[in-house]
Amino acid sequence: MSVADTKKGVEQKMQRSIDAFKSDLAKIRTGRAHTGMLDHVQVDYYGSMVPISQVANMTLVDARTIGVQPWEKPMVAKVEKAIREADLGLNPATSGDQIRVPMPALTEERRRELTKVVKSEGETAKVAIRNLRRDANEALKKLVKDKEISEDDERRASDDVQKLTDKHVAEIDKLVQSKEAEIMTV
């Protein structure tokens, strides 16, 4: 394993951590509707649980309503039930073969709770990034110990890993700030 492999590997892992954090943020409900909120809803499709996106089209009707159109008529009741039981605080309403999912307005107290959740998720993501930095630095130290690289190379590589860490932590901070602003916007 070379220095380049170590740096490339840690950067890929950090990016995956950022992507996982983004998907976690997408699940946190804001006052506005977006189809990504329903991505993790699982529907019973003839005995097996599948994501809602595999049995229905989802569209935005307006800023506060998601329209869900199951591809098969018999699935309407099952999709509605799955949305209701997904613990998102949503109350879908069916009209024919179309399901409308209105977003209830968030209270000020709930908004504050959600910003705390966002900050907590952000801290968890930062810890994951820092753990990746630690692992990379340990791998570099092992390369020095095995006499595969010099201490100067290790120091330069450690600085590069630190720069990657700083870049990804700053990206997490930016994502947290934008999500908080989105939540607090009435």
Curated annotation (Swiss-Prot):
The lineage of its organism: Bacteria, Pseudomonadati, Pseudomonadota, Betaproteobacteria, Burkholderiales. It comes from the Bacteria. NCBIfam families: frr (TIGR00496). SUPFAM superfamilies: Ribosome recycling factor, RRF. Responsible for the release of ribosomes from messenger RNA at the termination of protein biosynthesis. May increase the efficiency of translation by recycling ribosomes from one round of translation to another. Keywords: Cytoplasm, Protein biosynthesis. Its main location: cytoplasm. It is found in: Cytoplasm. GO terms for biological process: cytoplasmic translational termination. Belongs to the RRF family. This is Ribosome-recycling factor. One of its GO terms (cellular component) is cytosol. The gene is frr. One of its GO terms (molecular function) is ribosomal large subunit binding. The keyword Cytoplasm applies. InterPro entries: Ribosome_recyc_fac (IPR002661), Ribosome_recyc_fac_dom (IPR023584), RRF_sf (IPR036191).
